Amino acid sequence: MVDTSNVKLRIENIVASVDLFAQLDLEKVLDICPNSKYNPEEFPGIICRFDDPKVALLIFSSGKLVVTGAKSIQDIERAVAKLIQKLKGIGVKFKRAPLIDVQNMVFSGDIGREFNLDNVALTLPNCEYEPEQFPGVIYRVKEPRAVILLFSSGKIVCSGAKSEADAWEAVRKLLRELEKYGLIEEEEEEL
């Protein structure tokens, strides 16, 4: 059985797509979003930043958004609610409640032990390691779909997960593989 008691994971970023079910006049939206940029020749949406919650929103005339920089699902929900309140203030009508779809969650973590990445790369399936290009092993998990970057220090970055549960499952799969191939040594007992 894989022991995850020493493993720590922390959310670094959540990216979500959102459908507001409303058409938006971006020139009017620009007036209600003080920390924003809009240059339609370069990009078809408004780039808007909120300080609380600290997120960035890409706002499109179709009523679709991309929210990034969130540290929790609640941050995304709060940012969307905040934008909706501002949009109602300029007369935007919504056909229904917004639909929020998490696209990607990025976690940083620590497995709590060091690894010889050459051994890991030579032994573990579904991984890549090019130390001249990147100092970590890239391990791909098929289900749930995620990518884990494993560094010799035992630090990890997990991206592509759509939930915290998926990230933990991906990490457990990596640990099972490391254990299966003898790449995790048992801790020596203190005398």
Swiss-Prot record:
<dbReference type="GO" id="GO:0003677">
    <property type="term" value="F:DNA binding"/>
</dbReference>
<dbReference type="InterPro" id="IPR000814">
    <property type="entry name" value="TBP"/>
</dbReference>
<dbReference type="InterPro" id="IPR012295">
    <property type="entry name" value="TBP_dom_sf"/>
</dbReference>
<protein>
    <recommendedName>
        <fullName>TATA-box-binding protein</fullName>
    </recommendedName>
</protein>
<dbReference type="GO" id="GO:0006352">
    <property type="term" value="P:DNA-templated transcription initiation"/>
</dbReference>
<comment type="function">
    <text>General factor that plays a role in the activation of archaeal genes transcribed by RNA polymerase. Binds specifically to the TATA box promoter element which lies close to the position of transcription initiation.</text>
</comment>
<feature type="repeat" description="2">
    <location>
        <begin position="102"/>
        <end position="178"/>
    </location>
</feature>
<feature type="repeat" description="1">
    <location>
        <begin position="11"/>
        <end position="87"/>
    </location>
</feature>
<keyword id="KW-0804">Transcription</keyword>
<keyword id="KW-0805">Transcription regulation</keyword>
<dbReference type="InterPro" id="IPR033711">
    <property type="entry name" value="TBP_archaea"/>
</dbReference>
<comment type="similarity">
    <text>Belongs to the TBP family.</text>
</comment>
<keyword id="KW-0677">Repeat</keyword>
<dbReference type="GO" id="GO:0003700">
    <property type="term" value="F:DNA-binding transcription factor activity"/>
</dbReference>
<keyword id="KW-0238">DNA-binding</keyword>
<dbReference type="Pfam" id="PF00352">
    <property type="entry name" value="TBP"/>
</dbReference>
<dbReference type="InterPro" id="IPR030491">
    <property type="entry name" value="TBP_CS"/>
</dbReference>
